[in-house]
């Protein structure tokens, strides 16, 4: 977890993206605190229209929504600065 938190704020997009997507597929083993910790610092990058950041945020949230839809809805509601793409992807199957 400490490594992923470091990677989430790395200067390189692809390192940040690995941190954001590291728990995709983990289902109920997903750590929601860690997920938020790696996504939140990247929301400003998503606002800068960096496609791969916006897509990764949405993908990570969409995947976790299969396990914890209420958590994902609450996360999206708490972050109105999410890009449209991230928001659409997160809520796609809800």
Name the predicted role of every residue range.
Residues 1-94:
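Alpha-helical scaffold domains
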């Amino acid at each position: 977890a400490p490594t992923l938190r470091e990677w989430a704020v790395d200067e390189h997009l692809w390192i940040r993206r690995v941190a954001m997507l590291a728990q995709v597929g983990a289902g109920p083993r997903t750590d929601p605190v860690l997920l938020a910790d790696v996504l939140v610092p990247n929301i400003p990058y998503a606002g800068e229209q960096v496609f791969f950041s916006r897509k990764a945020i949405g993908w990570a949230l969409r995947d976790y929504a299969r396990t914890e839809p209420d958590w994902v809805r609450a996360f999206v509601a708490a972050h109105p600065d999410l890009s449209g793409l991230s928001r659409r992807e997160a809520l796609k199957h809800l």
